[in-house]
């Protein structure tokens, strides 16, 4: 019945597969070619095809790299198949027979001696296939081995195998030379005693593919090593097959020859091949649950002309999961076996009538080290409505994410760096990119500035130099840019715009005055009518007509109604109307003269004399007067200059620099100085003041407190590597014999569980060809395959949050690392961390899906013992223990139907813990890391996101001996060396200062970057005696700013100009470098400071480009000429 089920399924699947017969083979390539004959390998498992078509299978390649010619030769196989005997109606050990025939297969993975080495030297590929067959259909697996140079020569190509087309895709990893495992670049090391190299020494599970190479010689007697290693009873090893396995580790390595006693990798592979000879199964997606029907044990003649049986096999029907190609062991010549529908004997405890696999795939544990992670460089340029960005890293990019950007999976490489191009569609918010675990911020405001400058320069392309000089002023973001535009427009066109705008304003005001006058007249008339009506109602009665019921406004109108309405006439137009109320009311709505009596009253009411007042004053205002225009022009220039100066600095985000004037704030010590605040984990804090004697202000002492960003240190227990795997449920049924009679392929899997239902007790659980009740066995097997390491887990034992605190109090310089509930205490200063708000706790498990620099997840519940399949931590490989398999708590059920093969059912979970976590990953807390340091027992990092907070308390005592501590002998000299970056931009500039210290060994202080009026940034630094180089970053300024290095009120003599913001690439800045709070109490910029700033700008804008002043003056003269034409001076005649 299993065969018929397989036929039905294949008949349904085959037409669908023929519609889409193109499949992908991925070959992972490192982005450098290392020394040695390294090759890369890829493979793909293809859908089933008829067994009869396998004889015509030949791989055909369209790749630019030639295929090795040796694979085009025909290999003779002994095909062993089984069939039922015609005279047998009951299943038994003698109810079937095996048949051996000779077949020719072309392109199978029969590698010759030195073939891989020759293909590397001649730049040729090796393309071959393996077959996994039952009695009816075969599933091919296509393999391709190419020299590593192909990664630089090709991106993709096409291979044909029978009805299938396989597209080979060369995919670059970010690894320099290593293998990508768990998102990290692992470099296997041949030495067992290897120590740390460039990274951390570890043991990783690496995928391996091996091919048997038949060659005669005393050094190739493989079964001699089998006998030594596995205590085999193989006595006649001289007459066994001779040769070796050649293996590729991790999809990218130099050839490994198995067995080689002095190569640890080789012996690991050798152990895997002979302890688990079936290796990884060849199940396709959807074949995790399948049924075998074991027909029975069989013997066959290999070759077909042999006089006696030489190979033991087990016949089966059902979905094939393992390779059907093997090598007979009982001959020194390689006898190739093709056994569709039969498992050859691969157990070599007894070497009689056995075989070895032609190919083997599996996993081995290898020691090695992980490649170091290099920082990223990210920059962007404006492109259309968004930004085009690139990221570089010397050692490759393992992770780059940003939800607002489109990051392509196809990466390009430039020399030894990896280049990743991506597009961000929005530039209205800053671009935050996580690259190699670093948080990079690209300030898009600078990109918009560049686009603005480009646009203005393009519009005035006749004078590009002048246009660019003006554009860099106008395109400063915020109010400052608008203030600059207003200032330039007022200077150039104020003489025309001032009278024009004044005229428009006067017109609007006169219109409003006229409206108010008319409105007042109407309101006055309404008031008179209301008073008349009230008086009439008090003396005479109602003002409503008795006939038409219309309410009249005057007595004369009421009297007209009394005469006309009884005569059926309209009192207004004397038109005939029906003598009904409704008719009169309807007529009044269309009558054109109902206001006749109101107008007569308006004429009789004496109008109030209108005094021109405001309206006349507006008419007489001399807005064309040159004196008025000049006065307003000067006033607007002064006002706009002050507003411009006040807005010449950017509004910063918190916590960063706040622009202030020169100097340091002072605090009179009447009482103790206490500061109490919270500080994010990613922020530095600098507090600087002059403490003055309240009794004598001339006496002071310098105080400088520096608190560095938080360091998170955890003592951990390395739990090992977490694996993902596929759980398979297989049913193996045979009609006779005990369950222990056969060995199934899952018996050699690392993790497996079996439940046997031995000796069927009912006819309802037996197929029709079974002998009867009380015989046979149904074996239910659960096993894990396709194991893949996905992450590393660490359990937190203890956790510590610490900061480094340094205090300069006069001459005294002290530093200490303090943690939570700890204090820095000196004679005058006390700095304490009172508490920390954190999301980590003791006992949590940290899981890293890639390099530790990329951050990870926090698990509150992680399985460490009696793990069930599906739990976090279900499949683990600790370094100090063997492979830990999960428990399968579900129960089996044997499903029976009359005259059909029993089927095993499992009611437990079939989804791995990793897949469950990935499906609900948003429900777990994550964290990012920076400045990572780690060993097996301890991990330290800094939080780039500022997700944690420390409660800080600073106390400075008022009891200070100013007489003895006031004098500070330290002398500081300043010199400005160089400047990088741009003024007025979001990214800012970096000033390089040469600072000399004399008279004392060390001194903690701050160096500022300032122009004549304002300081834009500061750097807290510990100076040592002699010359020190200090880099100070700042943001803001203007085109006239001459940036100098300053210390307090003292600045370097020579300053430097920064570049203008333009279309250059905007580099991403590290958030850890940019996150700092600086407080030195310097005063804010006042009126005097604003004027100094305006003067510096005005002198600076013209100092380098006098043509700009000439052009502006030309525009001014043009506006004066235009004013004289449009508003000529009125000539007054002398009386």
UniProtKB/Swiss-Prot annotation:
Pfam families attached to this UniProt entry: Hanta_Gc_C, Hanta_Gc_N, Hanta_Gn-B, Hanta_Gn-H, ITAM_Cys-rich
Transmembrane parts of this sequence: 486-506, 628-648, 1106-1126
GO molecular function, one term: zinc ion binding
Biological processes annotated in GO: endocytosis involved in viral entry into host cell; fusion of virus membrane with host endosome membrane; signal transduction; symbiont-mediated suppression of host innate immune response; symbiont-mediated suppression of host TRAF-mediated signal transduction; virion attachment to host cell
GO CC, any one term: host cell surface
Motif, YxxL: chain positions: 615-618
Disulfide bonds: 29-151, 63-157, 109-128, 133-138, 175-185, 210-247, 234-351, 376-435, 380-389, 405-424, 452-475, 735-770, 739-777, 751-885, 765-896, 780-904, 806-815, 823-832, 863-867, 970-1000, 993-1045, 1010-1015, 1046-1051, 1085-1089
Topology Cytoplasmic: residue spans: 507-627, 1127-1135
Glycosylated residues (UniProt): 134, 235, 347, 399, 928
Signal peptide start and end residues: 1-18
Start and end residues of each stretch annotated as Binding to the ribonucleoprotein: 516-533, 588-605, 592-603, 611-625, 1122-1135
Domain annotation ITAM: ranges: 611-634
Chain segments carrying region Fusion loop: 757-777
Lumenal side: 19-485, 649-1105
Assigned protein family: Belongs to the hantavirus envelope glycoprotein family.
Name of the protein in question: Envelopment polyprotein
Protein's organism: Hantaan virus (strain Lee) (Lee virus)
Gene designation per UniProt: GP
